[in-house]
Amino acid sequence: MTVSNLPDALLLVAFGGPEGPVDVEPFLQNVTAGRDVPADRLAEVAQRYLSRGGKSPGNDRMRALLAAVQTELRSRDLVVPVVWGNRNWHPFIEETVEELERQGHQRVMAWFSSPYRSYSTCRQYLEQISAATEGCSVSVERLRPYFDHPGCIEPAADRLREALLTLPADLRDETCLLFSAHSLPLASADTCAYVDEINEAARLIAERVSPQGQHRWEVVWQSRSGSPHVPWLVPDVGDRIDELAGLGVQAVAVSPVGFPVGNFEVEWDLDVEAAQRAAAHGMSFARADTIDQDPRFAAMIVDLLVEHCTSGATPAALGNLGVAPAACPSHCCPPPP
């Protein structure tokens, strides 16, 4: 099989984050536009960012990933420019599309930093891309979701193994593995594949880290926002740590399975809040690193591009849910009610 019909460019699509203190408030206004987020909650989140210099680690992570993807493409003698666009901060998707048009690129493939399907991790990005390309010469197709791709699962398993090694030796075999992902309103979670895909990815990672089943493992949720009156996915990671301490669990290792690319929510909600909850119980705590800096992750992005452009290619997938389509069905991931 030969690679043919390569696109004019590859667009890496991400959430975005502030680059400094002056960016925090407008960034959060973008994130919460049209949502019922209490003002005190917004102020609380803003203070968290400001306490760490007002900068999200996500942008630097995406810059490094873009460079790694460029290197991987060159190693395969594939000539495809790589660009980057965010949903919520510069470079915005709209800005990147404008630049692509100025450069004469027409056919563009997009890779999403979240491998899971929900309105906020999938369709909302597609809607923004559609609006950005309306009336211009740039056409954007997305690469397929990759939640169970070996380039996603194997690095995550390695990062979790490394995290376990930082715990006291006498507690490692009894450590509870927690797989954390961004919570969603139940009304949204019930209309998409998000929860099933998170659970499948967690299972695949757990089976590699604990092949004999010696470790208990669970999926937990983090970073909920919005109205406190709206039910969201539970258990919250901090609440579950409290419950596990009451059950006598002495150590937890958290894999940020929902966040392949490092961001502020991982560093705050897990490294600060979840770690503090564990420390309050005298519980040993470790957090696995995200996988965006693993060379296999950048290689996976190029693999997905090559797969899309190669007639008869067999998709690489480890799970039991089937390969998700690149083009979402019209009924997939509807907007929240």
Sequence positions of predicted segments:
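Active-site-proximal alpha-helix that buttresses catalytic centers in soluble enzyme cores
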Residues: 2-337
